Amino acid sequence: MAFITKQLQETIFGIIVGNRDVFPDHLAKEGRKQIIEVMEEMGYNYVILNEDDTHYGVVETYEDAKKCANLFKKNRDSIAGIILCMPNFSDEKGFASALKLANLNIPILIQASSDEIDKMDRKHRRDAFCGKISVCSVLYQHGIPFSLTSSHTYPIKSEAFKNDIRRFEKICNIVKTLKRARLGQIGTRPAAFETVRYSEKILEINGITIEPIDLSEILGAINKLQNDDPKVKEKIEFIKAYTPTMDFPEEGILKLAKLSLVIEKWVVDNDLDAFALQCWPSIQDNFGIVPCAMMSIFSEGLIPAACEVDIAGLIGMFILQLASGSPSAILDWNNNYGDDPNKMVLFHCSNLPKSFFKDTRMTIHPIISDLKGADLTFGAIQGRIKTQPCTLLRVETDDIFGEIKAFLTEGNYTDDPLDTYGGYGVIKIPNLQQALKMVCNEGFAHHIAATLNEVGEIVYEALTKYLGWNVIYHRD
């Protein structure tokens, strides 16, 4: 493979099955068996007490809770989230003690099993409906955040529960990955773009590390590469297969290939999740290229690449990728669409991943070429964005209040007619004018991260409930 790609991380859940002494034990035993079957059917790894660790391998007493907590602490680095299963009323103190002693500080999903109308006798009645309320109350008292299922109760083997687990997995991935994220910064921001300034210190205290490198170091490494290097040739072939390049000179593709190879090595050597790049003006003056196509390829391979050294925008891209499992992009809030107050044009010039487009081709940069000339600005990706639902996210470090904040909304790309350049699409957002007022009044940048998926609720829950970020969620 000529370009590295990030593999989606394997998700491991910690499982706690509850029980309560005055309710039928066989329900807890069967519940443990069922949740294991669901985990294996869905392909998840899990950490759970063995049947000989406690009575049936479930948690009821304080001694049970200690055993569960010790097991979870041994697997602290691998467990991404915890699922509480309540086959009967279950003991709220057992759950709370296990969570408090383990002290993993990760997302928690609470499932409670439904009673069946024809099985409401003493042997079969669960009362998990009531028990779930009790568990939630106690976790609230302990200050332990948790997630709820789409229905208050349902069977462990229901499709609804499986869908909720998939949703919960995304929340877990966002929380776990952001707490140890490593992002690269190539060069300084363009001098004209104060809008993309950010606080590295605020990010660091939230677990996000920035690894900087000067653009001159990248260019210096490029100068040491030979044109006939087999790795360079591999990159050239990949770029040509990625998007049509018929109007693109071989010299330009060679430069893109070398740039890609050097940045790829830097990403691997520093174990980076994503990077932002000074894409103008220095690289045109000193290397004679625009890096948009290279950035598009990295983003398509699940290594988000943001332009104009927009680290805050890059974080938005990374979050949306974690929430959706698919590539993300960064765009400008760019134009009105006629007189429609709820439609606008999202645009960049562009480095969008190929999967965003109906079709693509490589071109000279439509804007920078007017300033620098066509010979120095090969490498942009052009095309229209697909007609699909979309989630938009802007992250900022607010130095005034010492916090991370974000703006989040959802919309739909349309097929309204538009003849323009770059990477673009018409998007409809309910009550768009109010959304724009929020963006302006709160000092958000003109960049917005995007994914072609509806993941707003997942992002909102992860960022607010588990990371404590200040998120403005604009929705219909």
Q: Which positions does each model-derived feature cover?
A:
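N-terminal basic/disordered segments at the start of proteins
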Residues: 2-42
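Cap/lid and interdomain-hinge subdomains that line or gate substrate/regulatory clefts
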Residues: 3, 8-14, 46, 116-234, ...
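Extended hydrophobic packing segments that form well-structured cores
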Residues: 33, 373-476
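Glycine-rich, highly charged phosphate/nucleotide-binding loops
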Residues: 57-77, 255-262
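Periplasmic-binding protein-like
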Residues: 78-88, 109-111, 272-278
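Short, acidic/small-residue loops that bind anionic groups at enzyme active sites
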Residues: 96-125, 133-138, 296-309
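Long, internal scaffold/assembly segments composed of regular secondary structure
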Residues: 234-237, 241-323
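C-terminal catalytic subdomain
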Residues: 302-416
